[in-house]
């Protein structure tokens, strides 16, 4: 998109004032109009590090005029960083932490946004994605992150915000890009992105993926492979009616890794306390396995109506299967004294079938002197989920790490300092074939309107109603014959809204205040994307969240650079806590107060930058009657988080870049109490810095070589925390050389 400015700025001057601009000084911007200079028009392109808008039609204003924190992570940034999965992409979004899963889900994307669990708030092209997977980037065009309660956009859940993955679709031009990469740690990756125009109004796009990796800094037994294919066909490229058909298949096979156990004496990982090697892998190669497979079919229909109105309908069916048998390293104080780690089995088999359909009508109209930009829509979604357990049978397996056996069963009891993941596994692991089953239906209606009263004042409104109905039967009671199932059901009507006021002192700047809400039904799971319900949770009313945010956004340096800042307070109420022995009630409460700063775009035509900082002052205001968590920080809510990435074009053919990422101390749980043996209940990981770098050289018109180096200082850090048993190590230092062939 082209832009026009009457205030050009020399390249040297822009670089000199870059740092003060990051301080968000709109007053200085206003003062610059005191002297009248001859008007000169400068024409250029927005930086590809500064996306203009989010993908969803529910956003009825550009990002610079949207009265809340919305961060868009663009495709070029993902490519420059060599980010191959969603976890790496979200490293660019301060305020988001990934947590480790349980119940056989260590390899899935489980984000926390501003200290609130957002595992159920992941979307693909605006439709909720209930699958349990570690997502690859081979078919991503951008990632949109909404921060703060956003049920008005995303529906049920959304207490901390939501994440929308925007996929690649056909374009009106021919191109093919083939990438082949080889890296340290036996890493191989290949992708193909091709687009072909077929006739006047049809285009085909095809994205392919193949990768095989081990994990840098971990035992070579920890390996995985991914394959993916995503074809899409668009009919009516330039006509008033457009239809896009898309398919998606993705498979992720791996040896699962629960990483490093906590030291029960301190609550920190044993790599920090007794100096065990970060390469230690406590799993069993001959028992453990993980296999995730996802299918999706999408149909999008768009039609241009009169007066600039547009209508679109998006429908998608998806099926996700997860089979995971893994080791959770369990370390107790008595085992620690003997130098033993219990190889505790964690396994599950899950199948999730879902269908969603969304229809939107959007456009612009005037009422007197007021300009309305609106979106009206409705959505229906249904999902069915099953979850089964496994049973392990091993001769003489009782108390494998007790003094009775003295750790003589190495299949279940590993050496703390020198575990052998290749020992024989003498037993069997079989699925029970008595799954829990859940069924959820949601009907939604919503409306959004941005009202421009004049060139300076805008009002942003949003309203949503969700009819939420869920039912299910839980896993059978252990040992009961015949099987005894607990059945439960609940129906809720959820109303959510947002209100935002925007003042634009200049066309390239805005100041805003906003209020928004979210509703989280009791069946929304903390550690899974899909819903589940129990006899206890069916009695509980939905949690409520609300947020107040004030902020400012400025497009500076001839609109090449977007600089943002915001302060907020978010409150979550009605969380389920134990108020008396055996009695739960929606009486819990938590609060997060904080601020965010962001920068995205170009300092000069050669110098791009993307970064941000988040301060989260979180507190569990009201907790369980016997918990030591009250008054403590929330889990997965680091007080400080910072990221910065920058590239510079040294020569027309050569681009170099580097990035820094910081996260302060993070808790896996919020409990400040002590166990009966005097050991702390709290689990936490220390702060860390991580540094990455890249260089790309265009060898000729069609071929480019790019080198990425990750974790330059080979820092031992922890990318994910879990509330009780373990923390997941981040990868060690590695490098990847990728050749890109484009034509």
Swiss-Prot record:
TBDR beta-barrel domain span: 173-743
Signal peptide from the UniProt entry: 1-30
Keywords (A to Z) from UniProt: Cell outer membrane, Ion transport, Iron, Iron transport, Membrane, Receptor, Signal, TonB box, Transmembrane, Transmembrane beta strand, Transport, Virulence
Any single Gene Ontology cellular-component annotation: cell outer membrane
Topological type in the membrane: Multi-pass membrane protein
GO molecular function terms attached to this record: siderophore uptake transmembrane transporter activity; signaling receptor activity
Subcellular location per the Swiss-Prot or TrEMBL entry: Cell outer membrane
Motif TonB C-terminal box in this chain: 726-743
Record keyword Endoplasmic reticulum present: no
UniProt entry tagged with the keyword Iron: yes
Source domain of life: Bacteria
Location of the TBDR plug domain: 62-168
Protein family according to the UniProt entry: Belongs to the TonB-dependent receptor family.
Xref: PANTHER family: BLR3904 PROTEIN, FERRICHROME IRON RECEPTOR-RELATED
Function: Probably involved in iron transport.
Protein name: Probable TonB-dependent receptor BfrD
Source organism of this protein record: Bordetella pertussis (strain Tohama I / ATCC BAA-589 / NCTC 13251)
Lineage, top ranks: Bacteria, Pseudomonadati, Pseudomonadota, Betaproteobacteria, Burkholderiales
Name of the coding gene: bfrD
